Amino acid sequence: METVDKLEAMFQKAEADIEYVEKRLKFDFMASAREAGTFEGNPVELLEDLSAIKARHAALCAQVEEIAAEQKRSMDSIRAHLDTTVQLVQQLQNTADVQVPPLTEEEQEARDALCSSVAALNVEAMPTSEPQSQAQSEAQNVHEDVSEKTFETVPRSVRGNLKLKDLNALYKQLFEHFSDKSRGPISTQRMKKLNMKVNDSALKTLQHLKLIELDKKGLVSLLAND
């Protein structure tokens, strides 16, 4: 029981640490917005902050996976030792000349408590991956405009006289179009019929930034965000 209690305490502390990091991320973001004098802030700075938060969130998810894996290994070890002990006792009862006396009431209570603890740990560990996967999926479905800094990395020979706002307008329209996962690649003519602000410079720029894919037929597909 002492080992199980220590194990539960370790997992509870890990969960508390995760909650603290999450609250700290929210607090830092709100504090940064207040220092800028507005909750909207500078769009470029907000995008940079969002990238930093996503990176910290990814690190946090990795820690959660490690904790869940360690929790599962601990439960498997406890269950294996318990099964081995029960088998040894049964083997002794079957082979020894002297029958092992039945468990006392106190021993039975200790055994039942240990089994209950293992079962409780198993129930708590199972849903860990579902909210984490959901959070990662939601993070991947968030649209981000191309920042001015990123835009400047595209050679002038590729982007020509393209303006950043026109590039982001087309990128957002494509993102919204492909939010329906059942939609396949789209042609330039189809984009024009949908009133998208499409032009060769914008498509080449998005392709250069690895945000879209152009096949040999000129059909456009949106690449998944990292």
Curated annotation (Swiss-Prot):
Superkingdom of this protein's organism: Eukaryota
Biological processes, Gene Ontology terms: attachment of mitotic spindle microtubules to kinetochore; cell division; chromosome segregation; mitotic cell cycle; mitotic metaphase chromosome alignment; mitotic sister chromatid segregation; regulation of microtubule polymerization or depolymerization
Keyword vocabulary terms for this entry: Cell cycle, Cell division, Centromere, Chromosome, Cytoplasm, Cytoskeleton, Kinetochore, Microtubule, Mitosis
Main subcellular location: cytoplasm
Compartments (UniProt record): Cytoplasm, Cytoskeleton, Spindle; Chromosome, Centromere, Kinetochore
Annotated function: Component of the SKA complex, a microtubule plus end-binding complex of the outer kinetochore that stabilizes spindle microtubule-kinetochore attachments, promotes alignment of chromosomes at the mitotic spindle equator (chromosome congression) and assists suppression of the spindle assembly checkpoint. Kinetochores, consisting of a centromere-associated inner segment and a microtubule-contacting outer segment, play a crucial role in chromosome segregation by mediating the physical connection between centromeric DNA and spindle microtubules.
Assembly and interaction partners: Component of the SKA complex, composed of ska1, ska2 and ska3.
PANTHER family hit by this protein: SPINDLE AND KINETOCHORE-ASSOCIATED PROTEIN 2
Protein name: SKA complex subunit 2
Provenance organism: Danio rerio (Zebrafish)
